[in-house]
Amino acid sequence: MDIRKRISIVLVALLALVGVSAQAQTVSGMLIDGQHKQPLGYAVVQLLGSDSTYVSGTTSDDTGRFALAAPRDGRYILKVSFVGMRTLCHDVVVAGGKDKEVGALTLQADEHVLREVTIAAQAPKVVLKNDTFQYNASAYRVAEGSTVEALVKVLPGAEVGDDGSIKINGKEVKKILVDGKEFMTGDTKTAMKNLPASIIDKVKAYDQKSDLARVTGIDDGEEQTVLDFGMKQGMNKGFFSNINLSVGNHGRYSERGMAAYFKDNFRMMGFLSANNVGDMMFGGGRRGGFGQTRQGLNNTKMAGINMNYDNGKTWQWDGSLRWNHNNGDLQAKVFSDNFLASQHAYTRRISQQYTRSNSWDGRFRLEWTPDSMWNVMFRPSLQLSKSDGLDVSTSATFSEDPYAQGDAPLAEDLLATMQAQGTLVNRQRNTTVTYGDNTSAQASLQVNRKLSANGRNVTLRLQGNYNDADAKTFSTQDLQYYQLLDAMGQDSIYRAYRYNLMPTKSHGIGVEATYSEPIARRTYLQLAYQYNYALSKSDRSTYDFSSLGGGYFDGVEPAYRSWGSYLALLQQPLGSYFDQSLSRYSEYKTHTQNIQLMIRMNQEKWRFNAGVQLQPQHSIYQQDYLGVHVDTVRNSFDWSPTIDFRYKFSPQSNLRLFYRGSATQPTMSQLLDITDNTDPQNVSVGNPGLRPAFTHRIHAFYNGYRQRYTQSWMTFFHFASVHNAIGNSVTYDASSGARVVRPVNINGNWNLNAGVMFNTSIDTLGVWNVNTFTTVDLNRYASLLQQSRQSLVERNITNQTNLSERLTFSYRNSWLEVVLDGSVEYNHTKNQLQSAQNLNTWRFAYGGSINLTAPWGTSLSTDLHMNSRRGYNDASLNSNELLWNAQVAQSFLRGKPLTISLQLYDILHQQSNLSRVVNAMGRTDTEYNSINSYALLTISYRFNLFGGKPQHPAGVRRGDDGPMMGPPGGRPPMGPPGGRPPMGHPGVRPF
């Protein structure tokens, strides 16, 4: 057949297909919660025939919207059901081949459920609706003026890390929503540290579907865990604000303001804050756990605005803009025990680091749905940042435990003693001044077209990114060896004084097309193709002043961007110190294709996704470094299988099983057979024989809920094993303390993480409650160690076991909450080559908290916890710390909008800051500086204007059921210490 005829036939067939699909009819509408007058998401919506036979079904989205397919004209029954609501049946007539919009449908609460709630008197702490954990904020009391971070910390199954990361039921939270709307996308900290807990009614934790799954209606398994904060009834109309001013001793302060405006379909929130206390809530940490490690002193400022608009029909948009400023003052005392084949290597380091940064981040999302068949989504973003850093450190390496000689290993007398004993390997001092300027932009456009009402659709996605970075670094390194002699028989000395200019640019574009075809009832075949192109260029210029002699720059006081002071001492033009071999130019191009084939089965009780992704890649790498020119091409082929199964036993009980395999290619720099000895203490060597690593990931999750006893439970299991993991082979030189690191393929790396959570009321009124959360973490790290180039390579295995249990008992009524809690964490580390370095450490925490509210507006919050450590080599770390924090607050004026409070932190002056990290290469204990004990006097004022009239509702405390529950917004109570006032160009203080 002639090729033109074939093309004509295909075009005619496609036009016919589009013509037929254009006749498809859709029944759509919106669901409303009749009690709270809010959109009702996750309700089950079914379209039944006139004889009640099933036709199609779906669930309402976060905004309460739904859309179902009606295959032909006729009479239908629209059935809507939701836990705790009366089932609604609505007659629908579809005629003339046109879509049917049924408008807003209101569901009323089930009277039987209402009677149960009335009898209970106290709202259940947590309920489960479909796949959503819904926490009632009124059931968790936090101190006056708290932000939602304090609220999240006391939720069952929640963890807030030292870096501000959030985990719910073992899954990391990637996004924050407010009333189902995007909020400060890409930044969870802004919401956590600025949203007042007093305005929150419910906190939902669930997996939000991807943009593609949401518009196609076909679950693609690419969801991300979100926290959705639901505001109290009546607070999403009009204007309200919270202003908080705090001042304390030791120069502590915390100021924060928040304002929100809601009108019709538009909402806007603005934030301002400045503090040097970290805003990390109660110093004793979460209930039943340990406080967060305070890493230095920090002075932060923030301004942000978030806007949302939804006309309920065709247009939605979300936008956010934020500015962040940070000044940091971090002093770290680090002790490392490095796992070597048959010999010890200990390192003690003290560093003083100053940092400051300014950043802007703007993000926008525009969604246009002109009709039931088309959806267009556009997401642009822009980030600007500048940063400065100053780091001065002193360190020494030993062949024997230096603490056997004394508690200050870097003291001159102890260093002299260990030098005489032959256990001092090296000693060094480093100074580094850094600057960075970065601009980046991203954009994506997604267009979806439904070709029929039964799931046939096509999606086109375009994306691009651009990055322009400029960095400068001036560094000095003075290193003295005590077991390595020079030609004169003296201790060897190495020095490196260098100035680096490092411009970097990169950009990328991508295009993706996805087609979904229904092949059976609720079964779809999905084919996706994606092409990405990326280009990255880096051109580092290095100027080497090492030949000028030791101490040449000792007269310069280190400060931000002070390289001018260093360069002014040069006797020759800067260009004469240019070092071609140390300079590095690289250019990296990649052409990546992703081909994915998936089968998706979305049944009423279960969902099953299975498929495979193929990824051929073509890479071109050019580099000029250390006198070696590289121009190489690599072609690789990766594949990734996926299986995802979900079963819904009931609306309150769900099971999910997930498997994914993925390949990881070694980087080009790892493959190049080049020895990089620019840092003699850390020499890297490439390995052309590296193979790609393949990771197997298995996840399981099960949850359930029993409404009668307000019982909820959850268990999860995560396992990952890596075949041909890209690890390191380390050769240690005992005479210098230097390491030669070469990437190698290692088998035997895996990790397992599992947990169980159970929450229940003891009595029928829900006054007495118990929560338990148990976790198990098992990690196995493999590495290769070599004592010298002539010795044998030995395989080292480090096994780490971490067990933890948190138990909480609580009593609460309308004016009092009493909590007793405790936790225990056991960590066992076993090293194969050095059994003497096996570790068994324990951490205990136990105590309680009280929140009391008097009718006349006085409130008292206090917590008392004993934190204990055992099993650390440094005896000073095996401590008992009794942490006591307290706050007293008094509200004034009609409606209690004005509150004055006094917060006392670490009253007994016993809190310390310590972190431990264990991996295949060793263990590291770090102690940080901080101001833990201080007091703050806070004035908070809340203003509300709804419907054009100012309102100051009764100042009822969190836990009552008034329309404006909770304390006035304010500063997060009991925050840990932060930083100093803004620093200019700090000098370096002696240790």
Predicted regions and their residues:
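Short, polar/charged loop or turn motifs at beta-strand boundaries
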Residues: 132-154, 167-168, 178-183, 244-249, ...
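Short, surface-exposed beta-strand/beta-hairpin micro-motifs centered on an aromatic residue
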Residues: 61-70, 165, 191
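A short, solvent-exposed loop/turn motif at the edges and junctions
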Residues: 48-54, 75-90
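Primarily recognizes Gram-negative and organellar outer-membrane beta-barrels
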Residues: 186, 209-251, 265-991
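Short, acidic Ser/Thr/Gly-rich low-complexity loop/linker segments typical of extracellular
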Residues: 50-65
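Structural motif
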Residues: 30-40
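Periplasmic plug
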Residues: 128, 165-213, 226-231, 266
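Short, acidic, small-residue-rich periplasmic hinge/interaction motif at the N-terminus
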Residues: 32, 46-48, 81-85, 95, ...
